[in-house]
C-alpha cells in the first residue's frame, strides 16, 4: 500500500528500511512513549525482524511513514475481534528530527481514513500515556476526541502511569 501525502508517504514497510528504522527507533524519547513490545535499545536486528514479521500479516495494518524516501516512523492499527470487530486501536511514532512539522498528524488522518474505508470500522481509539502531551495534540488535530483517563493503567520503565483514551468515531448515518 502507498498513500502519497503532502509531508510524507505512508506505505508498506520494505527490508531496505531496516537501517533507518533502527537509527530512528533507538531513541529514549520514543521508547518512553511506546509499549514495551518496542525493544530498547532498538537494533538493526530488531528492525529486520520487525519488517520480516509484517510480510505475512493479512490484512496489512502496519505502515512506514516515509519522509523524502526515508522511513521516519510507523503508524498502524490493531483490528478488534468479536463484538468489537467494528473498532481498532491505532498507534504511531515519528523520529525526533521530524517532530513539529505536522507529519504525524497527516499520517494519522490518512491511516484513520484508510482503516475506516477498508475495514468498515465505526471507531478507532488510541491510548497515549497521560504525560505525552505531543501525542495528545496530534490526536486532537487529527479529529480524535478525549473520552477519558484510565487511571494507573500502565507501567513504563518502572513507573505506573495513567493513559488517556482518545477516539475517532464515525458519525451515525441512521
Task: Map each language-model feature to its residues.
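Acyl-donor (CoA/ACP) binding surface of acyl/acetyltransferases
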Residues: 1-29, 62-174
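Conserved GNAT-fold acetyl-CoA-binding loop/helix
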Residues: 29-52
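A short helix-loop-beta-strand connector motif used in the catalytic cores of GNAT acetyltransferases and
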Residues: 52-64
Amino acid at each position: 500500500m502507498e498513500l502519497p501525502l503532502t509531508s510524507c508517504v505512508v506505505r508498506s514497510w520494505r527490508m531496505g528500511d531496516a537501517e533507518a528504522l533502527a537509527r530512528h527507533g533507538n531513541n529514549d524519547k520514543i521508547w518512553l512513549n511506546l509499549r514495551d513490545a518496542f525493544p530498547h535499545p532498538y537494533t538493526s536486528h530488531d528492525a529486520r525482524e520487525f519488517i520480516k514479521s509484517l510480510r505475512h500479516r493479512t490484512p496489512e495494518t502496519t505502515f512506514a511513514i516515509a519522509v523524502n524516501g526515508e522511513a521516519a516512523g510507523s503508524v498502524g492499527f490493531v483490528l478488534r475481534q468479536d463484538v468489537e470487530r467494528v473498532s481498532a486501536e491505532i498507534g504511531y511514532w515519528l523520529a525526533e528530527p521530524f517532530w513539529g512539522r505536522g507529519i504525524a498528524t497527516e499520517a494519522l488522518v490518512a491511516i484513520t481514513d484508510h482503516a475506516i474505508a477498508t475495514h468498515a470500522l465505526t471507531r478507532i481509539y488510541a491510548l497515549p500515556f497521560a504525560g505525552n502531551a505531543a501525542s495528545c495534540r496530534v490526536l486532537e488535530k487529527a479529529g480524535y476526541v478525549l473520552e477519558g483517563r484510565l487511571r494507573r493503567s500502565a507501567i513504563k520503565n518502572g513507573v505506573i502511569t495513567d493513559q488517556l483514551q482518545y477516539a475517532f468515531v464515525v458519525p451515525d448515518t441512521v
